From Swiss-Prot:
Keywords: Lyase, Membrane, Metal-binding, Mitochondrion, Mitochondrion inner membrane, Transit peptide, Ubiquinone biosynthesis, Zinc. The lineage of its organism: Eukaryota, Metazoa, Ecdysozoa, Arthropoda, Hexapoda. Zn(2+) binds at residues 177-178, 181, 193. Residues 21-32 have a biased composition (Low complexity). This is Ubiquinone biosynthesis protein COQ4 homolog 2, mitochondrial. One of its GO terms (cellular component) is extrinsic component of mitochondrial inner membrane. It comes from Culex quinquefasciatus.
Amino acid sequence: MFLRRVHPVRLGHAIQRSLTTTKSRNESTTTTVEAPQAVPSPPPDAFTEEFLRNQIKVTELQRVILGVGSSLAALVNPRRHDMIACLGETTGVPALDAIRRQMLASDEGRQILADRPRINTRTVDMAALKALPETSFGHQYVHFLEKHDITPDSRAEVRFMDDPELAYVMTRYREVHDLVHTVLGMPTNMLGEVAVKWVEALNTGLPMCYGGAVFGAFRLRPK
């Protein structure tokens, strides 16, 4: 007797209105989630394109074999620049990564990694450097190249590395090698190379540089 009797028709209408309201509320709160569109990656820069053309992918086992074989070949014949280059690439990743972190810590280093400048006859006006005063670094650099009949275009391409940015760091190291010779006033004979390798080893931490500095010294003979 406490419940008021409800007319069946009115009860049906009330239930229908309730269901309609609930459905509308659910539809209003349901949002359509669209799949994120893939952002196209920027095209590779000129250095990365060149590196990918020359790259030779190797497994870790192959990397170890190349490292051991190239080190032995370089010991037997220090003039095997191809073996020295292979040794540097297969053993130098930790040191190159440390160099990259150090470069990223400065504005100048970040700019170099972003622009990836090269040092060769296509990017540097050697004639303009030669025309500089004799006491200038640019003039002395060209004088060193001409005196020893070498060219910055002779540096080997990086092949046995995976990371293009680390490959650039290795390329940068190779292209400034003759600049170090110029600063130190060292020739390209065994004594000069050993001296340069010690400076490079202490500044880069590359195992190949330490190997060249230590084992190269054993090949020096008194005159």
